[in-house]
Amino acid sequence: MILPPGTILQLMYLKERLRDLPPGRFAEIGVGHGHLSACLLAMGWRGTGFELDPDSSRAANERNSDAVASGRYQVRNVDWLETDPDAPVDLLVSCMVLEHFDDAGEALYLEQCRQWLSARGLGILLVPGSPEDWGIEDDIAGHYRRYSRESLETRLTSLGWRVQHIAGLTFPLSNVLLPVSNLLVRRAEATRQAWSMADRTLASGKRTVAGKTSFPDWVGLVLNEVVMYPLHQVQKLFRGAKRALVLYTEFVPENR
């Protein structure tokens, strides 16, 4: 499957950050179609994905069918916030999930992280950045907020976490593409603005927008990690950019 350019850049950064961390047990919250889980599995991790939408759950299981068959991975179609851990995990990660919660739900999510992480575990969040760039995609996806570095770090700190690392990702590529992205989303998905926040959130992991989330096969000649490696280096160079549309954050308990 051909991934969007922003997703490719995010996964490249994640893999680079985790390359020196010994693989262990992970949980991914809101797996969508399972691309981030696939990245972790390829690095030797084993774990569980949680997904509210049954169609996305099936897609994630199919995407990672070899790991499912070998017992290294499963997707549970349940609400993670209401689930107790079988055992602590070494890595707890979510991509474009936290912004779907209101303030109370956001606090509950971060408290649940405390119950799931092992004593030396690491939490990772990828969330929308640059509040100035709020747009149609936030509306149709059921977002409550976009984060600034300051607001994200303040929120984590206030709830007993310490930010170990924070970086802005996909800048400047996603910013250059944003007007086209907004146009494509408005044409394909504007009617979702009339849906409830819950329904918009549920559908956010299974979007099909030609030219944004789905591409003809030949585009894979360009949208791949080899061709996009220079843009990965550029995003690292500009990881301090305030207008970066994605924030990557690693966090641990404040007393560690």
Annotate the PLM regions.
Residues 56, 131-133, 170-173:
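Feature marks short, surface-exposed loop/turn motifs that line or immediately flank catalytic pockets
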Residues 145-160, 166:
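Short alpha-helix
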